[in-house]
Design a protein with these regions (language model features):
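Conserved PLP-binding catalytic core of the aspartate aminotransferase-like
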Residues: 130-165, 180-190
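Structural motif of enzymes handling amino- and sulfur-group chemistry
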Residues: 65-141
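Conserved PLP-enzyme active-site core in the AAT-like
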Residues: 1-65, 77, 152-153, 180
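A short linear hydrophobic-aromatic micro-motif
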Residues: 129-130, 168-173
Length: 190
């Protein structure tokens, strides 16, 4: 979900980013948490390649290969293998299928829709919930718990009441710097 607002719009490497964790849920249509196995590959710039742990996927002249061990000559500074398995492989396949089915232009549109939907939802909910910040948001909306003041209701109570009414609640208490944070991540393809 952390890539939703920029997928198809920019390349992290062009921003000087050397390492990035990409959540496959939401951005690339894979389940998360209670809805299924989460998955988040970590991508590295070429500059950090020799330090990467294994297993890893490398692009060699347009062919993608799975590197299982760090004994290869270009991985001499790797600290070795992280796990004995390759993560939630089904989620990688699902994400790749999603990307291929949308294509470059489709992914760019998905990104634009994510930002549009988030801002529409923010505007729609702002008379009921308190936005943590003024102005536009990207692909998710952050509210604080000011709307609950003087009610005796806490953020957790509010989220549990949503479950009682048949709604999946938003992420609560994250990020930690926002008191009583309620993080809403609308979908962009439904």
């Amino acid at each position: 979900a952390n890539f939703n607002a920029v997928v198809g719009k920019l390349k992290p490497g062009d921003l000087g980013i050397d390492a990035m964790h990409i959540n496959l849920h939401k951005t690339f249509s894979t389940p998360h948490g209670g809805g299924g196995p989460g998955s988040g590959p970590v991508v590295f710039s070429n500059r950090l390649e020799k330090f990467c742990p294994t297993p890893l996927v490398k692009n060699i002249k347009g062919d993608f290969i799975l590197v299982e061990d760090s004994n290869e000559k270009d991985l001499t500074k790797s600290f070795g293998r992280l796990n004995v398995f390759h993560g939630q492989m089904g989620m990688f396949v699902r994400a790749m299928s999603y990307m291929l089915s949308h294509g470059a232009d489709g992914l760019k549109q998905v990104s634009e829709d994510a930002v549009l939907n988030a801002n529409y939802l923010r505007a729609s909910l702002s008379s009921h919930l308190t936005p943590a910040f003024d102005g536009f948001c990207m692909h998710e909306i952050l509210f604080n718990d000011d709307f609950l003041k003087d009610t005796g209701v806490e953020t957790l109570d509010f989220a549990k009441a949503m479950i009682d009414e048949g709604y999946h609640p938003m992420t609560i208490y994250f990020p930690l710097v926002i008191h009583g944070a309620l993080l809403v991540e609308p979908t962009e393809t439904e």
